[in-house]
Amino acid sequence: MTCPIILDCDPGHDDAIALILALAHPDLVPLAVTTSAGNQTPDKTLNNALRILTLLNRSDIPVAGGAAKPLARDLIIADNVHGETGLDGPALPNPSFSPQAITAVELMAQQIRKSHQPVTLIPTGPLTNIALLLASHSELHDKIERIVLMGGAAGVGNWTPAAEFNIFVDPEAADIVFKSGIPITMCGLDVTHQAQIMDEDIERIRAIPNPVAKCVAELLDFFMIYHRDPKWGFVGAPLHDPCTIAWLLKPELFDAQDCWVGIETQSELTLGMTVVDRYQLTGKPANATVLFGLNRQGFVDLLVHSLAAYTPTYLNRR
């Protein structure tokens, strides 16, 4: 059974790898790629999505840029993590095609409306575009199968002590999404910090004889630099965004629990916090499936086997 998807991303090293992972699997049918500001400015994240799709020879997938800033706040970017381009490291090709002359929200609505099956949305950046879609197209809610997002944490944050970056950038958007009533899978830091790629994993990827695997290895070489800071306590680099795709492909790799999740939009200390009611203390019904555990080796094996699919025949099939 195929699963139609729309990836809403802010590439970003781990966004790029999530996109590459998704497009290696024919069962995931990409209806569109949309971009948001976050890891870099909106012009750069849009260009990066086009560059990755050019590398994969997937100019058939429509692409559109989204909101230039959060719903109610100034833009924050993570250039300290992802570099000046947002994808520092490999020599990526220039885009071979142009984005659609419509907004991300318009493209998502168009593709959801046309789809014969409910569509799964996969946002791996701030949730601005998804919130705008839900607010402006309530008639399409029933055609959205699920939102599988990377964001939040039941424990500590990575941008502030309380908040994960994607949610902190646009907490008002996250609040809209989590209150939407649409099924949500939350891939937060609790699980993504377990999805660490080690040096030996990067060498395993580098040994795969195709240009896509080479690109991923070089992306990871750069991504490792930031995460070697001892303050994080990491052995490797956490691949946050690919957890969304891995859960869709192999949910058995993950431990999950249905929880109520609320978004803090007011507090000076905890702005952007995802308040996860793991012990049912609020009495509120669950609104998200929250991922807590991961089979790391199974995750790495899935990534490696997926990258091996990008043979010359596969890349030139269109």
UniProtKB/Swiss-Prot annotation:
GO biological process, one term: nucleobase-containing small molecule interconversion
Catalytic residues (positions): 240
Record-listed E.C. numbers: 3.2.-.-
Domain of life the protein comes from: Bacteria
Similarity remark: Belongs to the IUNH family. RihA subfamily.
Function comment: Hydrolyzes cytidine or uridine to ribose and cytosine or uracil, respectively.
The protein's name in its UniProt record: Pyrimidine-specific ribonucleoside hydrolase RihA
Organism encoding this protein: Shewanella oneidensis (strain ATCC 700550 / JCM 31522 / CIP 106686 / LMG 19005 / NCIMB 14063 / MR-1)
